[in-house]
């Protein structure tokens, strides 16, 4: 009888998995068993795809789970008689490869190709039914030429622009991060560094042009996890309201504009709050107030990753409420954000919890303008009333339901010129500039006469230079490479410079699924006829951590390229499975934000950083090379076989997290 408490050793005399699996995998390869069948009019197709891996050098059990789940689905669909496309590739650009190459004093290209070779052999050990004929890496020139081509297509469509902007700067990786790459604690998604703000000239994509369609089309994604759709919905953050203009009493020509979703509470406004960088700050002349604002700026800078106190500084500025001409004091407040709306908000303490707390702390009037029942009168409130109800203390709108009054007051404002109906989004345009070497070069030339000029498509690819200097703990920036940077302007012909920023790696992964159906196409990124046959992907498998990064960007790319008439599909992925993560212990130095390899720790029962002797926090986290907590599946496969490894990783529900402390 088999006991669940007993450990059993594999009897290699009875069963030698390595020998059996090697034999049959060779037969599969020789017979090209998993080559994708050509689609005909009568073919029933199925496109199965895992989010392609970053070639870190070694697979871990988290990778295995992702690819085995997709493989099970692909095999099942083949058994049903369908033509199955199940490809694999490599998300090969990015900072991890550049940093690893610097540490070892070799080219990122050499490092990456070596890793791809090793990881490919590991994937083959798993016996995946992959069509390897369609393989590519995003760092291949014959791939990133088409990333540059698509950049130019988006440029022609008016979806690419450059501007000087305050950006998120990673001081460890020395590069810019998109908003989506900064976590809720204000730290870099990759290095863990506390992100700083810096003013730089950057390239952006107008993803906001598609905000409404990206939001509406979530309703079409019936076979996506609800939590992923909610995350995208919240990230896009649509707010329907109005911009309200308040005159400044000392200067009738000067106005302050406030966005609000609650015009029904305008009669309850008892203060306006502006950010520390609002343009009105320049109108303040009182030196004590100016110094207080500078102190608040420093406080915000020092505490940007902590919960902020509701600090307020009353100014001498007075606004005029457009609905009743009452004077309203203007405060500088710690909670007002520069990057959202107009950098100014109206304070309605009676009907907003945050405003209520701010008003109580700063002795600001609280005026109730909504009650639950028509018969109620205003009273002293113990807390903000935030439910629907009926207006009071609101002149001609008294007794009207606030949901109706919201529309009527906005309409009055529009008719009288002090309001404008407005839809606002939390989503910001996608910042794609990166100040590092190992990425796709941006196909732009900077000319003193013509400005920034896009290259002609015949001049692609703009290839990365191979004569790189790896010294001083960095790879020389593209701007320091005179052999590479100097060129001529494609417009006027005078001497010019190539753009020295490279693209965010998500640019490469936002369209890779479009390349697989015609991966050998040499004169365009993909064959339109093949896209229309195979897309959308029938089953996509990958981690939920990509909900507002890769998945949102891929949806945007698909819609933008559709509008450029490159194909007809609206959405890239029909079904999405976000498999549960495979976790293992990771050791983090909270002082530096860096993870430490367990092999470098003397005593795992009392883990300390070997460099500064700091006590390490033990976290049970998703397996990752950057966290040094991956478990190598090769050792499992070598001892127990691929089928055992596949079964082990597939036994639990696919969407659940699988904690593991596998010892082989």
What are the functions of these language-model segments?
Residues 54-85, 188, 317, 340-371, ...:
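Conserved active-site neighborhood of enzyme catalytic/cofactor-binding cores
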Residues 257-277, 502-513, 545-548:
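Conserved phosphate/anionic-ligand binding catalytic regions in large, soluble enzymes, centered on
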Residues 2-6, 14, 23, 27-31, ...:
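Residue patterns forming the tRNA-binding/recognition surfaces of aminoacyl-tRNA synthetases
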């Amino acid at each position: 009888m088999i006991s669940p408490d007993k450990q059993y050793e594999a009897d290699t005399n009875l069963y030698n998995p390595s020998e059996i699996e090697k034999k049959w995998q060779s037969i599969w390869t020789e017979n090209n068993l998993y080559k994708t069948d050509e689609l005909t009019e009568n073919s029933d197709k199925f496109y199965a795809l895992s989010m392609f891996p970053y070639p870190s050098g070694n697979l871990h059990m988290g990778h295995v789970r992702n690819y085995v789940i997709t493989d099970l689905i692909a095999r099942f669909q083949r058994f049903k008689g369908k033509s199955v496309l199940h490809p694999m590739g490599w998300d090969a650009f990015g900072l991890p490869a550049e940093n690893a190459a610097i540490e070892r004093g070799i080219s990122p290209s050499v490092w990456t190709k070596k890793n791809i070779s090793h990881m490919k052999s590991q994937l083959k050990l798993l016996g995946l039914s992959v069509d390897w004929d369609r393989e590519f890496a995003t760092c291949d020139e014959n791939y990133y030429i088409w990333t540059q081509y698509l950049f130019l297509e988006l440029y022609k469509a008016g979806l690419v622009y450059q501007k000087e902007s305050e950006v998120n700067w990673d001081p460890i990786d020395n590069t810019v991060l998109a908003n989506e790459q900064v976590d809720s604690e204000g730290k870099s998604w990759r290095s863990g560094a506390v992100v700083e703000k810096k003013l730089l000239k950057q390239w952006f994509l107008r993803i906001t042009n598609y905000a409404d369609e990206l939001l509406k089309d979530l309703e079409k994604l019936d076979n996506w996890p609800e939590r992923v759709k909610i995350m995208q919905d919240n990230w896009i953050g649509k707010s329907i309201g109005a911009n309200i203009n308040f005159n400044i009493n000392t200067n009738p020509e000067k106005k302050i504009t406030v966005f609000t979703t609650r015009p029904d509470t305008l009669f309850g406004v008892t203060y306006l709050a502006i950010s520390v960088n609002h343009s009105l700050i320049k109108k303040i002349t009182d030196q004590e107030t100016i110094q207080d604002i500078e102190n608040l700026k420093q406080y915000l800078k020092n505490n940007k990753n902590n919960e902020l106190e509701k600090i307020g500084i009353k100014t001498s500025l007075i606004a005029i409420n457009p609905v009743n001409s009452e004077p309203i004091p203007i405060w500088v407040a710690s909670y007002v954000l520069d990057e959202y709306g107009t950098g100014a908000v109206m304070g309605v303490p009676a009907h907003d919890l945050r405003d209520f707390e701010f008003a109580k702390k700063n002795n600001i009037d609280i005026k109730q303008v909504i009650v639950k029942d028509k018969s109620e009168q205003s009273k002293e409130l113990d807390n903000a009333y935030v439910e629907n109800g009926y207006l009071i203390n609101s002149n001609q709108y008294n007794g009207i339901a606030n949901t109706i009054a919201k529309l009527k007051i906005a309409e009055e404002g529009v008719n009288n010129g002090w309001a404008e109906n407005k839809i606002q989004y939390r989503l910001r345009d996608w910042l794609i500039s990166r100040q590092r070497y190992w990425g796709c070069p941006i196909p732009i030339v900077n000319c003193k006469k013509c400005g920034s000029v896009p290259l002609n498509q015949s001049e692609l690819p703009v290839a990365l230079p191979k004569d790189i200097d790896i010294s001083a703990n960095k790879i020389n920036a593209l701007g320091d490479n005179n052999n590479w940077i100097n060129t001529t302007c494609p417009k006027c012909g005078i001497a010019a410079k190539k753009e020295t920023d490279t693209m965010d790696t998500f640019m490469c992964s936002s369209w890779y699924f479009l390349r697989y159906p015609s991966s050998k196409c040499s004169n365009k990124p993909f064959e339109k006829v093949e896209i229309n046959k195979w897309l959308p992907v029938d089953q996509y498998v990958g981690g939920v951590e990509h909900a507002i990064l890769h998945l949102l960007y891929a949806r945007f790319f698909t819609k933008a390229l559709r509008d450029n008439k490159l194909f007809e599909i609206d959405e890239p992925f029909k079904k999405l499975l976000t498999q549960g993560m495979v976790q293992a212990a990771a050791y983090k130095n909270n002082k530096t934000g860096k993870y430490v390899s367990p092999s470098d720790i003397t005593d795992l029962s009392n883990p300390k950083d070997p460099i500064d002797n700091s006590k390490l926090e033990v976290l049970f986290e998703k397996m990752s090379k950057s966290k040094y907590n991956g478990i190598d599946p090769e050792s499992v496969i070598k001892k127990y076989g691929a089928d055992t490894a596949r079964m082990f990783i597939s036994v639990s529900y696919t969407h659940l997290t699988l904690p593991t402390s596998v010892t082989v």
